[in-house]
Amino acid sequence: PLAQVTVVAPERNRSGASNSLTLDVPLRVAEYGPRRHFVNGTPTDCVHLAISGLFDGEIDHDMVVSGINDGANLGDDVLYSGTVAAAVEGRFLGLPAIAISLVVRDGRHFETAARVASEMLLRLQRAPLHSSMILNVNVPDLPYERLRGLKSTRLGHRHRSAPVVRASDPRGRPVYWVGPAGEGADAGAGTDFHAVANGYVSVTPLQVDLTRHAAIDDIGEWLGGRNE
């Protein structure tokens, strides 16, 4: 086999959970079969538990694969994505990590994304990348045979999301739904949006450091020249 897989997943959909950890209530884990567990927490909780003590040293993890997410994680999505956040947590804990998402349209070709994930694992086994790098992989919703290949990409950028939707609960009180994500704004050649739209698997290298290093001196001047 390619690998021995241990599944630790949220017990329900936690889309948009980002990097949140559950700190104010205890987490409960249910076992649904050999090496298959569900947690009443976030994707980040799942990875943290799996690597940091859930198995009491019985399992030696060497990689984190998050997904397959039912939907795109392109551009700004990575800031909100629980799928990407789970991979980031794996990197925090010192393991190579991949986030896999299927850009679902109509066909829902999860078998395509699974095959791409297997190929990515083989590549990493043969030529490991530095553990500080996280790969964000988005797979077009196509039969595998129709994929045009893989592309190394950068994150694009979306238009702002649609306005919130106001509704009423059964008691007539107002409730609000967050509007859907905006379409691609920066979606030209070289972006993850462009690759997927043209039938390519997008592979974007991510890092945790959000510092805008080129602006450090500019901010020092803005602060009055004090950059001590």
Question: Which residues does each PLM region occupy?
Answer:
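Short, structured loop/turn "capping" segments at alpha-beta junctions
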Residues: 58-61, 97-99, 127-134
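A cross-family phosphate/adenosyl-ligand binding-site feature
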Residues: 1-53, 60
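Glycine-rich phosphate/pyrophosphate-binding loops
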Residues: 91-113
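Electrostatically charged, flexible surface regions
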Residues: 112-228
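Hydrophobic/aromatic ligand-binding patch that stacks against planar heteroaromatic rings
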Residues: 86-90
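Short beta-strand segments
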Residues: 9, 40, 66-69, 100-101, ...
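Glycine/threonine-rich flexible loop motifs
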Residues: 72-81
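Short glycine-rich anion-binding loops that position phosphate/pyrophosphate groups of nucleotides
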Residues: 13, 42-43, 69-72, 142, ...
